């Protein structure tokens, strides 16, 4: 069911969505039991919802069966207590359509659909790609995902504006690393587009120019602090929000010292969550960076 997107103060997916890691066992298989425990922990500690099988969830190295089983396990456990959004993007339009339709059939609350990567479509191709997905899964809310640093392709605000003619295209994860992206999207699309920061370090600046929340990595371990920062901003308590933002900056930086999700998996291990190493070709965090991360976590009393 597609909601009436008239209340900018009530974002469809909430304010804080955790882009959840995929836990692996020592034998390399997905640890579904631990995934359930982690998802519940996150939703009890600041997260309004979970994003599965995204960049942080290592979707490129998960089989379709693993992705399906992971979603079913987490969704069945959380039920309706929290939103579950599934990454269904692909650089093959037919694959993305099929994955998004399945997400709807299995009860997802939304789908995160990334800009096609590697083949670098022009804007017309991006419009055709997303409009085809929106038409095929017309009852499922979609979050566009613009991350040109990984895809090699930038989804322009003018194209997003055209795509908003589809009633299930309601939101975007803005991960270009540019604060101006929010301003440009607001200028092109107006206030009906729910814009989520794709970078923890840019959350507060992006809130100030119209973003509604964040698809977060850091919320794995500082979800309550992020929630407090957003609530403080909403109340006009800007000095409190800024103080939290500044205190968390070393952590935000450390979590992206190398390729995500390498650092966050190390951070989870350091805070008692044995989520396993990333799958090849990603590698565990090197000792020097892990020691630095440990010190930051200690300083934050996590």
From Swiss-Prot:
Substrates-to-products reaction catalysed: L-aspartate 4-semialdehyde + pyruvate = (2S,4S)-4-hydroxy-2,3,4,5-tetrahydrodipicolinate + H2O + H(+)
One GO CC annotation: cytosol
Keyword Cytoplasm found: yes
PROSITE patterns with a match to the protein in the record: DHDPS_1, DHDPS_2
Highest taxon, organism lineage: Bacteria
Biological process (GO), any one: lysine biosynthetic process via diaminopimelate
GO molecular function, a single term: 4-hydroxy-tetrahydrodipicolinate synthase activity
Record site feature (Part of a proton relay during catalysis), residues: 55, 118
Enzyme class: lyase
Main location as per UniProt: cytoplasm
Subunit-level organization: Homotetramer; dimer of dimers.
Record function comment: Catalyzes the condensation of (S)-aspartate-beta-semialdehyde [(S)-ASA] and pyruvate to 4-hydroxy-tetrahydrodipicolinate (HTPA).
Record protein name field: 4-hydroxy-tetrahydrodipicolinate synthase
Organism of derivation: Prochlorococcus marinus (strain MIT 9515)
């Amino acid at each position: 069911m597609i909601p009436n997107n008239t209340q900018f103060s009530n974002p469809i997916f909430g304010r804080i969505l955790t882009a959840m890691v995929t836990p692996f066992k020592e034998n390399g298989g997905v640890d579904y039991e631990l995934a359930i425990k982690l998802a519940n922990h996150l939703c009890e500690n600041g997260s309004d919802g979970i994003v599965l099988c995204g960049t942080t969830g290592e979707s490129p190295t998960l089989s379709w069966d693993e992705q399906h089983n992971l979603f079913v396990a987490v969704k069945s456990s959380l039920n309706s207590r929290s939103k579950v959004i599934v990454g269904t993007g692909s650089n093959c339009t037919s694959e993305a359509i099929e994955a998004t339709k399945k997400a709807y059939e299995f009860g997802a609350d939304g789908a995160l659909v990334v800009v096609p990567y590697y083949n670098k479509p022009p804007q017309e191709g991006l419009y055709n790609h997303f409009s085809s997905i929106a038409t095929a899964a017309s009852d499922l809310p979609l979050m566009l995902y613009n991350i040109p640093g990984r895809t090699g392709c930038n989804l322009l605000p003018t194209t997003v504006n055209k795509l908003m003619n589809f009633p299930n295209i309601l939101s975007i994860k803005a991960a270009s690393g540019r604060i101006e992206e929010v301003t440009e999207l607001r200028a092109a699309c107006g206030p009906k587009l729910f814009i989520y920061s794709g970078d923890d370090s840019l959350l507060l600046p992006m809130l100030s120019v119209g973003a509604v929340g964040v698809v977060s990595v850091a919320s794995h371990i500082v979800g309550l602090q992020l929630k407090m920062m957003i609530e403080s901003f909403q109340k006009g308590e800007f000095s409190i929000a800024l103080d939290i933002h500044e205190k968390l900056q070393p952590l935000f930086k450390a979590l992206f010292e190398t390729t995500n999700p390498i650092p966050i998996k190390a951070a989870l291990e350091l805070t008692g969550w044995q989520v396993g190493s990333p799958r090849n070709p990603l590698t565990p965090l090197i000792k020097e960076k892990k020691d630095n991360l440990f010190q930051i976590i200690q300083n934050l009393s996590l």
